[in-house]
């Protein structure tokens, strides 16, 4: 297969993915004797297109799956998408609002039709993006969290947990999103520090002079106050416990009660109790059997319990209420106060603690089982391990999970209420006399169905499902550390509860993709990067390799166009190295022609040794998910060892007349390049397939080729030391040429004073490499080389490298040239020093600019020191 002179990712990638899918390369093996390896994709939300975080996530999964397939596993990489209840509903509602329509105008059924249309549109976008990324997914098994099979699983789980008493319906304080008009779980609330105020009010005693001072950050909730509490041990209030105060504005009498919850040392030591609008107040209210007065509606507006403030937005009510209290001289003081305020993760609205009847999951026993499991052989391994502590901590402090949502898009709760008796029926099927029942209108939290993803996608609850029996538990979960609580923890406790096994063996957690300056990528900052744009510019292989190797497990990744471009340059280097190799291997060279038992040269032995070392390193690091280190190992071997050294060294036999040696070199080139392609394939699937198809190969695709294995018979330890000596000598000669301003094209005499006879013999046997890379007019290698008076000498491991200077350069002219260069460098150093010592510049210039100046100074100083040393050497 022809390779064009220049690497063009568009040409390389065009049609390749479609060919892989069409030929069924990503389907599991039909050989059931193979060990299985399963990854289920973390389902992206159908709210929109994939971002760089998704690209990173799925690239890592695809790398692991491709590698395991090559290692002989029966692999399944299962695709799917999440309905993303609140997020998708918000998108669809926003689209309708543009047309002046609300979901209530349409009604539930018509609205859901719109939501399904949205899902289909964005699902097709997502599949197209998966294809561009080259993900080896088995589309015949694609799942969606609202499809029939998963809906069946959701109903069974809900009903089973309800029957066990783990799911219950109750009235509690929940997090209410007044914009989305739905309940939220604790982890869907983002806490942000907000500049607010502490309002100190007078609550007058009902039957005596005086008042109790009460402080609050939410004055609007006082309209729902039902008591004042003080600590029974607080001497200040001993005489007033049991008395009453008048609730300002409202005029309602509130009892003064004793409760040890109150902190004597905080504020006045007295606090108001609003059971319907604060979780702690609710608990106090339960203990003292207080009335629950809800003063807001679901939109965050004051209701008819708020008196004259009815219909006002909660924050407008706050302002007006404070003004009214001022008029009645009931405001003691208002203090500025920065405090943590909960915001909806999805809508951004300030979350309201709100008394509501919802469905909950009782978490204590589920959490305990998850924690206990981590002490058994069935434990889940976290990468990095520190996240296991994060998981354990959360499980130890978990609260009951609010699972009902006041939405239409999602799994409708399988609970019905009898129209006459109010009886609750919970079941996988609707009641037979459905006309007498009304189904609960709420839907389940999106994460409820996502928590079942590893087993529901494989056919559960059908325990006889072939996929469930063969591919569960899954092997690895790859996801961001930001959803340990949302998703990872919930999959673990649901997996243990319903399958009695961990849902996955390993959890590999990565960080967030950040902008180059370290800030989070966001629409508001305008610093987001579309992965498809990157692919259009540099190709999928460049993006994949950057994402996979640019960070270590658990750490964030800074996106850098420059680094993606450097990967593109790396692929170009690979492409050019492959083209050279293929031209020398020849079209007639076949797999069976590869013979590594012949007369291997030093370069052959060395590159085969380094190849085997790299195979061992890459395999070991990949098993630990250390793909950043894998990237470095591959880069160093391919760029430095193979392309820069071996390919150049292979030109010696290939340009010679020894046909037997040429055939050996062809074998080594072919074998090494083939193994490089196999190691690179999981990272760069497109370009490796293209090059591999051009190489002598067996099989129809590199996708199904075997993973490289270490061959002990092709490890020649002694070659490494000899090659190290040669490379050091070559680098020394080239550096000396630069220092005396003599180009490589000019032949010069070179002397090598070997440290001992053994080294002399070794270097003499391999002098062809020194001649090729150093271009000497004469080359003298000996233990007793006489070093001329005027010479440039470098000490190396093998001895000394000597360049006689007599007749090579005009010493006086060279010293004069170097002194002028030194003066220029001194001038540049002075300029940079002046800039960096200028306080005005340092205080105003961006950090990037200052760092660039510091880098320049370091470069100039190194050059200055080098030139000065050369002058001193020449003068000596």
Swiss-Prot record:
State the Gene Ontology terms under molecular function: aminoacyl-tRNA deacylase activity; ATP binding; valine-tRNA ligase activity
Enumerate the catalysed reactions. Answer: tRNA(Val) + L-valine + ATP = L-valyl-tRNA(Val) + AMP + diphosphate
Q: Name one GO biological process term.
A: valyl-tRNA aminoacylation
Instruction: Extract one GO cellular component term from the record.
Output: cytosol
This enzyme's EC code(s) = 6.1.1.9
Q: Which Pfam families match?
A: Anticodon_1 (PF08264), tRNA-synt_1 (PF00133), Val_tRNA-synt_C (PF10458)
Binding-site list for ATP: 523
Q: Which residues form a coiled coil?
A: 805-876
* Segments carrying motif 'HIGH' region: 44-54
Where it sits in the cell: the answer is: Cytoplasm
Which of UniProt's keywords are assigned here?
Aminoacyl-tRNA synthetase, ATP-binding, Coiled coil, Cytoplasm, Ligase, Nucleotide-binding, Protein biosynthesis
Motif mapping: 'KMSKS' region: 520-524
Indicate the enzyme's highest-level EC class.
ligase
The record describes the protein's role as:
Catalyzes the attachment of valine to tRNA(Val). As ValRS can inadvertently accommodate and process structurally similar amino acids such as threonine, to avoid such errors, it has a 'posttransfer' editing activity that hydrolyzes mischarged Thr-tRNA(Val) in a tRNA-dependent manner.
Of which family is this protein a member? Belongs to the class-I aminoacyl-tRNA synthetase family. ValS type 1 subfamily.
Subunit and partners: Monomer.
Name of the molecule in the record:
Valine--tRNA ligase
